Curated annotation (Swiss-Prot):
Its job: May act as a positive axonal guidance cue.
Domain Sema intervals: 103-553
Residues annotated as glycosylated: N153, N236, N345, N436, T788
Protein name: Semaphorin-5B
Pfam families the UniProt entry points to: PSI, Sema, TSP1_2, TSP_1
SMART domains in the record: PSI, Sema, TSP1
Topology relative to the membrane: Single-pass type III membrane protein
InterPro entries xrefs: Plexin_repeat (IPR002165), PSI (IPR016201), Semap_dom (IPR001627), Semap_dom_sf (IPR036352), Semaphorin (IPR027231), TSP1_rpt (IPR000884), TSP1_rpt_sf (IPR036383), WD40/YVTN_repeat-like_dom_sf (IPR015943)
Membrane-crossing residue ranges in chain numbering: 1037-1057
Domain PSI as annotated: residue spans: 555-602
Species annotation: Homo sapiens (Human)
Length: 1151
């Protein structure tokens, strides 16, 4: 039906139907009047398909029933329906929006499953992050706190409070600072080997400590933080510890923040700094980063450009100093002599270049010798940002070029040639006062430090640019894709998002943003405090105001389809054609089947599906149902939250909701008769109907009548006689009395022969073995064995023993052969009754001289044993060839083969496991314990030299994994005492996300060792000396006392003579200074002359006001220029003053 008015007054039905039928469309006829009916019937067919489906609580009618609704608030409904008609009319601005190409974004909710978060009650400003991959931990410095977190999920390993003392805070506030400023903000955090060096503002009293990397609560050393950490937490600073252990810090070193310096301390070299109060060296700098590279220490900063003649502008700089610099002599004492700085150029090329002057962050990529920098426009100008990359070779080229020098304050800055164009921190070869000085002239070092040429980036255009956004932090990762190596940039913004971009020379991918990560909840905007990258774990660590986040660098598993995986253009991810999933190159099953498509920048999908807005308020309406009428409630909604955009789908679901309409119940048609309850014999059938056509609701009448009918069935179908098995008969007699026989029994099928199953059943019986019965064979006739020349002979006869169980006659076995031998004399006097055959043989042997009886040859060698173990046999044979029987001679008598037992030892046994024992009780009641069970290799045990059992002899299983009260596991046992006399124990948090009420406190504890556990090392002779104690008597004691008295007397005399000698020297030195009045402290009046003056000491000041190195007790200058005027007022004399009061005195009493 076209969208318009229908002249027919017939009402339509609310009927669900297939998409291609007219019944699918929800059409409402309004019977308030002809014009009203036509109006609504013209509007409703034009609803979106989702609004024409009868779903949910909407009233559904079928059949010829007609429905008519009266809406007092019809204008409200028509307005909602008409607004849904405007979805298809897209304004021109929306068409332009659909044509834009924007980079993809990852919403906070979509990123949360991949992110690990750490917060701590009361901790703020998580600005300092230091990675310790060897300890698998992240060191975090926050306001008043230090933390050790796990690199895997930033879970808490240790929390240590490092707050300022109450006196320090009160002193800070008395100087006009706020309570927020008068806290301890960590501003230096460096992991150096097994120590962590950290500095904090300490309520405007900077302090530094060195702590154990595995136990932050243990302080190894405390030193002054001045010139190493700023006073004010808002001042930028940076620091690096060189490979020689020297600290290079760039910060302001005074309370007011007007004395910036690049300062070296804590090493073997002398402390050095930049020139004090010299704006040409440093002009209101903001320090960004510091790196130890080769022979130099590099510092990246931004400052007011002193060489800019017109107005005030900010330039980005790179400065460097030689690590072997020892300062000057007489000129530039305690000051860098190798300090140089050059401008960093990051701009858009053109006839009038557009400069990004302010450096915000830097990242050193040592594998490529690259320095990436984040640059922005001035804070008061239009926001714009860029990322530029610089080669170290380009930086060195700028420092090897000419300098820029200003002769006087009114002169221009002009280029001047570099006296040492390839300066590499060389030193002077001469000895003496200039020993260890660099080869650079001190006069040049004092006036030539600004380079004339700027450091140019790798590419003329910035790697990445972005308007209307200010970048704040940057880290870079190297990713090996299938075809090339990519530099992936992670850029932090001041709004709290992280941009993931590509740095590549390809024009199609230049300035390509892969995605933007929203790490903060919607509506929250704050700059990132810190950004660190761990390449080995492919993870980002983000420092925020209230916590730390761990964000993975890749989320390949988030792309479910091949199109999404390849369309992301992510160098980390590719489609594995074999496994049919998105994975990294390392996780792919076959590199040849792993594909990527990084040919263009990814584009955000701006298509948006429509969504319904809120329902309008319920309005009463009436309906007509035949001769009766009732009331309903109706409401409507529009597809405008949001509207479909850029080809998105329309809203799915109904646009009109009709509910609470009163209905009288009506019966449905009777169902078909069910099957008869029996297959034979009398049964019954059932049919039903329900009061649901329609069901009564909202006050409607219920149906009148029965909902169930029954009737008899199968009255004339008798059941057949049942066929069944009779009982089993008795078991028959066993077929064998022993050795295992069989028994059977039978049953019969009653009323037929078609019973299911077998009619015969068998079972075994008499399984015990039968007794063995032996039988001997009769003796054989006597047979001659040896016949002598005289006619005497030996004869033998044989018989055999047979044995077999009666139940198995086929198992007959032959026993050992028994042999009897007798000797028969030649005269026949013996009782040798021979057989006729034997006599014939004997007579024939005596009558025929040519008859030769057989003789045995020698035995052959023994054969190999038939078995390797458990009693086998071996055999040897002989032949009747010595001689062979001839002319009717007798054959050889005896056996041609002889058997012998061999290898009676038992066979080797391979070991086998015994059964597992029962599980032991759980080792802990909470916090995670374990069961244990064991088995042994004794079933059987292996014989010596044979294979042992393979596998584990002990198994363990987890138990009692529920968390202990308050989330902590039980404390471990105290460890053994260390060399420092301390013990420690630890526990771990069982809660996945510990909150304020769970896992409070430290995860480790330490204590001094009890005296009973501290090992005491005694001399080797102590035992021997103990045996001689009984020989020490009173005589020995007296002799010892006298010896000690004499020794102390001699020592006292020596000390006294030494003091007298020193005092004489002191009197002589006093005469060097005449006793003239000290005009600075002249008291005047009538006091005695020797009481009118007080002692004073004058010293020359350090020219640069350097802070002495607290740890090495190193002072840069020898205090040679010291002048002293000394007077001794009565009643004291000159000997009452300690010699330390005067540096000129070098003799000290032995006191």
């Amino acid at each position: 039906m076209p969208c318009g008015f229908s002249p027919s007054p017939v009402a339509h039905h609310l009927v669900p139907g297939p998409p291609d039928t007219p019944a699918q469309q929800l059409r409402c006829g309004w019977t308030v009047g002809g014009w009203l009916l036509s109006l609504v019937r013209g509007l409703l067919p034009c609803l979106p398909p989702g609004a024409r489906t009868a779903e949910g609580p909407i009233m559904v009618l079928a059949g010829p029933l007609a429905v008519s609704l009266l809406l007092p608030s019809l204008t409200l409904l028509v307005s909602h329906l008409s607004s849904s008609q405007d979805v298809s009319s897209e304004p021109s601005s929306e068409q332009q929006l659909c044509a834009l190409s924007k980079h993809p974004t990852v919403a906070f909710e979509d990123l949360q499953p991949w992110v690990s978060n750490f917060t701590y009650p009361g901790a703020r400003d998580f600005s300092q992050l230091a990675l310790d991959p060897s300890g698998n931990q992240l060191i975090v410095g926050a306001r008043n706190y230090l933390f050790r977190l796990s690199l895997a999920n930033v879970s808490l390993l240790q929390a240590t409070e490092w707050a300022s003392s109450e006196d320090t805070r009160r002193s800070c506030q008395s100087k006009g600072k706020t309570e927020e400023e008068c806290q301890n903000y960590v501003r230096v955090l460096i992991v150096a080997g097994r120590k962590v060096f950290m500095c904090g503002t300490n309520a405007f009293s900077p302090m530094c400590t060195s702590r154990q990397v595995g136990n932050l609560s243990r302080t190894i050393e405390k030193i002054n933080g001045v010139a190493r950490c700023p006073y004010d937490p808002r001042h930028n600073s940076t620091a690096v510890i060189s490979s020689q252990g020297e600290l290079y810090a760039a910060t302001v070193i005074d309370f007011s923040g007007r004395d910036p310096a690049i300062y070296r301390s804590l090493g073997s070299g002398p402390p050095l700094r930049t020139a004090q109060y010299n704006s040409k060296w440093l002009n209101e700098p903001n320090f960004v980063a510091a790196y130890d590279i080769g022979l130099f220490a590099y510092f990246f900063l931004r400052e007011n450009a002193v060489e800019h003649d017109c107005g005030r502008t900010v330039y980005s700089r790179v400065a460097r100093v030689c690590k072997n610099d020892v300062g000057g002599r007489f000129l530039l004492e305690d000051t860098w002599t190798t300090f140089m700085k050059a401008r960093l150029n990051c701009s858009r090329p053109g006839e009038v270049p557009f400069y990004y002057n302010e450096l915000q962050s830097a990242f050193h990529l040592p594998e490529q010798d690259l320095i990436y920098g984040v640059f922005t426009t001035n804070v008061n100008s239009i926001a714009a940002s860029a990322v530029c990359a610089f080669n170290l070779s380009a930086i060195s080229q700028a420092f090897n070029g000419p300098f820029r020098y200003q002769e006087n304050p009114r002169a221009a800055w002009l280029p001047i040639a570099n006296p040492i164009p390839n300066f590499q921190c060389g030193t002077l070869p001469e000895t003496g006062p200039n020993e260890n000085l660099t080869e650079r002239s001190l006069q040049d070092a004092q006036r030539l430090f600004l380079m004339s040429e700027a450091v140019q980036p790798v590419t003329p255009e910035p790697c990445v640019t972005q308007d209307s956004v200010r970048f704040s932090h940057l880290v870079v990762d190297l990713v090996q894709a299938k075809d090339t190596l990519y530099h992936v940039l992670y850029i932090g913004t001041e709004s709290g998002t992280i941009l993931k971009a590509l740095s590549t020379a390809s024009r199609s991918l230049h300035g390509c943003y892969l995605e933007e990560l929203h790490v903060l909840p919607p509506g929250r905007r704050e700059p990132l405090r810190s950004l660190r990258i761990l390449h080995s774990a492919r993870a980002l660590f983000v420092g925020l105001r209230d916590g730390v986040l761990r964000v993975p660098l890749e989320r390949c598993a988030a792309y479910r389809s091949q199109g999404a995986c390849l369309g992301a253009r992510d160098p980390y991810c590719g489609w594995d054609g074999k496994q049919q999933r998105c994975s990294t190159l390392e996780d792919s099953s076959n590199m040849s089947l792993w594909t990527q498509n990084i040919t263009a920048c990814p584009v955000r999908n701006v298509t948006r599906d429509g969504g319904f807005g809120p329902w309008s308020p319920w309005q009463p309406c009436e309906h007509l149902d035949g001769d009766n009428s009732g009331s309903c409630l109706c409401r409507a909604r529009s597809c405008d939250s949001p509207r479909p955009r850029c080809g998105g789908l329309d809203c799915l679901g109904p646009a009109i909701h009709i509910a609470n309409c009163s209905r009288n119940g009506a019966w449905t048609p009777w169902s078909s008769w069910a099957l008869c309850s029996t297959s034979c014999g009398i049964g019954f059938q059932v049919r039903q109907r329900s009061c649901s056509n329609p069901a009564p609701r909202h006050g409607g009448r219920i149906c009148v009548g029965k909902s169930r009918e029954e009737r008899f069935c199968n009255e004339n179908t008798p059941c057949p006689v049942p066929i069944f098995w009779a009982s089993w008969g008795s078991w028959s007699k066993c077929s064998s009395n022993c050795g295992g026989g069989m028994q059977s029994r039978r049953r019969a099928c009653e009323n037929g022969n078609s019973c299911l199953g077998c009619g015969v059943e068998f079972k075994t019986c008499n399984p015990e073995g039968c007794p063995e019965v032996r039988r001997n064979t009769p003796w054989t006739p006597w047979l001659p064995v040896n016949v002598t020349q005289g006619g005497a002979r030996q004869e033998q006869r044989f018989r055999f023993t047979c044995r077999a169980p009666l139940a198995d006659p086929h198992g007959l076995q032959f026993g050992r052969r028994r042999t009897e031998t007798r000797t028969c004399p030649a005269d026949g006097s013996g009782s040798c009754d021979t057989d006729a055959l034997v006599e014939v043989l004997l007579r024939s042997g005596s009558t025929s001289p040519h008859t030769v009886s057989g003789g045995w040859a020698a035995w052959g060698p023994w054969s190999s044993c038939s078995r390797d173990c458990e009693l086998g046999f071996r055999v040897r044979k002989r032949t009747c060839t010595n001689p062979e029987p001839r002319n009717g001679g007798l054959p050889c008598v005896g056996d041609a083969a002889e058997y012998q037992d061999c290898n009676p030892q038992a066979c080797p046994v391979r070991g086998a496991w015994s059964c597992w024992t029962s599980w032991s009780p759980c080792s802990a009641s909470c916090g995670g314990g374990h069961y244990q069970r064991t088995r042994s290799c004794t079933s059987p045990a292996p014989s010596p030299g044979e294979d042992i059992c393979l596998g584990l002899h002990t198994e363990e299983a987890l138990c009692a994994t529920q968390a202990c009260p308050e989330g902590w596991s039980p404390w471990s046992e105290w460890s053994k005492c260390t060399d420092d006399g301390a013990q420690s124990r630890s526990r771990h948090c069982e809660e996945l996300l510990p909150g304020s009420s769970a896992c409070a406190g430290n995860s480790s504890q330490s204590r001094p060792c009890p005296y009973s556990e501290i090992p005491v090392i005694l001399p080797a002779s102590s035992m021997e000396e103990a045996t001689d104690c009984a020989g020490f008597n009173l005589i020995h004691l007296v002799a010892t006392g006298i010896s000690c008295f004499l020794g102390s007397g001699l020592l006292t005399l020596a000390v006294y003579l030494s003091c007298q000698h020193c005092q004489r020297q002191s009197q002589e030195s006093t005469l060097v200074h005449p006793a003239t009045p000290n005009h600075l402290h002249y008291k005047g009046g009538g006091t005695p002359k020797n009481e009118k003056y007080t002692p004073m000491e004058f010293k020359t000041l350090n020219k640069n006001n350097l802070i002495p190195d607290d740890r090495a007790n190193f002072y840069p200058l020898q205090q040679t220029n010291v002048y002293t005027t000394t007077y001794y007022p009565s009643p004291l004399n000159k000997h009452s003053f300690r010699p330390e009061a005067s540096p000129g005195q070098r003799c000290f009493p032995n006191s």
